[in-house]
From Swiss-Prot:
Periplasmic compartment residues: 38-202
Recorded coiled-coil stretches: none
GO cellular component: plasma membrane
Membrane topology: Single-pass type II membrane protein
Keywords: Cell inner membrane, Cell membrane, Copper, Membrane, Signal-anchor, Transmembrane, Transmembrane helix
Record protein name field: Cytochrome c oxidase assembly protein CtaG
Length: 202
């Protein structure tokens, strides 16, 4: 009798352990999925994988007697009514030379909009050698209705690009940007209205 009575309790404990293991697995997979995007972004920034350019604080001390053709591409994702384009479609700096180019963005909507630029370089092998000293893509951009903004990019091509087997024969690279909408802070009036509603409810 005692052995039979103890069996359901043991099975219950086993079932509980299985449930806990399943829940832990589900939560663990969810956490990994949430962290995958920022971790992948960090990996690309460090390695230059997938055409991600490098961010640096200093310029190159070496300038080669060889030029690199750099073309520019500008795009705007749905949700932003912006006119976004490069001032120059291409430049031909010397490899290692620090150069500034400019883009312009104009808000065509009747409301303030916030955007964040995402960038990459093609061919992807050149990404690790494309170094940005200054870029509007490092921060979010707010544009009021009808506002037009000049946005500089300061960069250079690392001279090491001519030494690597996978990149030494590259003569043209394309720097591409896409602006995506970002949610801005709520207006103060909206917050105050919410506070009044809470006070009345209390």
């Amino acid at each position: 009798m005692s052995e039979n009575a103890g069996t359901p309790k043991k099975q219950g404990r086993n079932n509980g352990a299985v449930v806990m293991m399943c829940l832990s697995f589900v939560f663990g997979m969810g956490a990994m999925s949430y962290a995958a995007v920022p971790l992948y972004r960090i990996f690309c920034q460090v390695t230059g994988y997938n055409g991600t350019t490098q961010r640096v604080d200093q310029v190159s001390s070496v300038v080669l007697d060889r030029t690199m053709r750099v073309t520019f591409d500008a795009n705007v994702a749905p949700g932003l009514q912006w006119d976004f384009k490069p001032v120059e479609r291409e430049v031909n700096p010397k490899i290692g030379e620090t150069i500034q180019v400019n883009f312009t963005a104009e808000n065509r909507s009747n409301e303030t909009q916030r955007g964040q630029a995402v960038f990459n370089v093609t061919p992807g092998e050149a990404g690790v050698y494309f170094n940005k000293v200054q870029c509007f893509c490092f921060t979010e951009t707010d544009l009021k209705p009808g506002e037009k903004l000049d946005m500089p990019v300061v960069f250079y091509i690392d001279p090491e690009i001519v030494k690597a087997v996978e990149s030494k024969n590259i003569h043209t690279v394309t720097l591409s940007y896409t602006f995506y909408p970002k949610e801005g802070p709520k207006p103060v009036a909206s917050n105050e209205g919410g506070a009044e509603k809470i006070e009345k409810k209390l």
